[in-house]
Amino acid sequence: MLTQTTGRSEAPSHPTMFARSVPPAPQTAYKGAPASDPLTQQIQLMGATMTFSRNAEIFGENEPADYLYKVISGAVRTYKILSDGRRQIGGFYLPGDVFGLEFADEHSLAAEAITDIKVRVIKRSALAALADRNAGTARELYALTACELRRAQARILLLVKSAQERVASFLLEMAERAAADNAIDLPMSRQDIADYLGLTIETVSRTLTALETAAAIDVPTSRRIVLRNRGALSRLNG
């Protein structure tokens, strides 16, 4: 089931979708694409609003990549289950972020709601046709593709770093994406962070404790991180 609140295009059906009310966004607001950019405007104008419950699958690995998604509220993870059963998280998408962009016709990763979420959905074919006619939309699609490529390259470099370097890099990345200066309310669990960084949850917890002991961060709750010494984190990040 789905909920379509506005938009001209027909909302896509999906067997794993659940229509429900979406709670307020987390305390930390996150930066996304400006509301005035051509791509965001077209997704808002032509897309359909859909909601997913926490942990619901949005799309599966190897499913047709027919739609592009923009996060309105909540958080999304993309992931792959490896042959040995381990989960590797490819990325986190927060309010304002666009996901589902693929270089092929199928999704290389699955996507799942971390929290109850609301997204704006547009058909990939409709957006591609618009980009053929609208230079602004074409530029934004190119910029989005380039951003995804940069993120992929950064992840390759991240996975050769030490545990402290990986965690420091992650915290700085989240702080950069957040509108808040130093306090970050993370929507993802420590297991999510571990699966993203290629570490165990125990290593993530020990590393956060070590960074707190070194006065680089405060950890008032399991999801709230306060950056006390960005310089120290930046030096770890290289």
Task: List where the protein language model places each region.
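Short loop/turn motifs at secondary-structure junctions and domain boundaries
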Residues: 41-42, 58-62, 178
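Cyclic nucleotide-binding regulatory domains
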Residues: 56-115
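Phosphate-/nucleic-acid-contacting segments
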Residues: 174-238
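Cyclic nucleotide-binding regulatory module and flanking cytosolic helices
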Residues: 1-54, 97-99, 104
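Polybasic "coupling" helices that flank or enter modular domains
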Residues: 132-201
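Cyclic-nucleotide recognition modules
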Residues: 91-150
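Short aromatic/basic micro-patch
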Residues: 68, 92, 121, 187, ...
